[in-house]
């Protein structure tokens, strides 16, 4: 009974990790496209600002939005790495996190 419970738990954890991995893969792709678009928008706004066709507020808004999209992309990549680690652990990998006060 204990063995069956452990097997069910391992299967459930593996399934959850795979679902998370698949979901983050799609979201990372979308975030990359969005980040590229915001980067282009920032470059266009910078050009318009240098030519006197955009205000400083518009330029700073473009910068803020581009940085927010880059931050979101980094967070999604972190989430994806975390999902890979969860999958590795669920599949029986020997992952041991270091305690905060331990030295590597």
Where are these regions (language model features)?
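Terminal intrinsically disordered/low-complexity segments used for targeting and assembly
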Residues: 89-104
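Amphipathic alpha-helical coiled-coil segments
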Residues: 1-72, 79, 83-90
């Amino acid at each position: 009974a204990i063995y069956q419970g452990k097997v069910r738990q391992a299967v459930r954890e593996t399934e959850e990790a795979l679902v998370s991995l698949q979901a983050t893969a799609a979201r990372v792709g979308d975030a990359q496209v969005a980040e590229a678009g915001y980067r282009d928008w920032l470059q266009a706004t910078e050009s318009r600002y240098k030519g006197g066709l955009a205000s400083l507020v518009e330029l700073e808004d473009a910068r803020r939005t581009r940085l927010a999209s880059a931050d979101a992309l980094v967070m999604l990549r972190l989430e994806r790495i975390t999902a890979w680690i969860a999958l590795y652990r669920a599949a029986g990998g020997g992952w041991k996190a270091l305690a905060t006060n331990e030295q590597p």
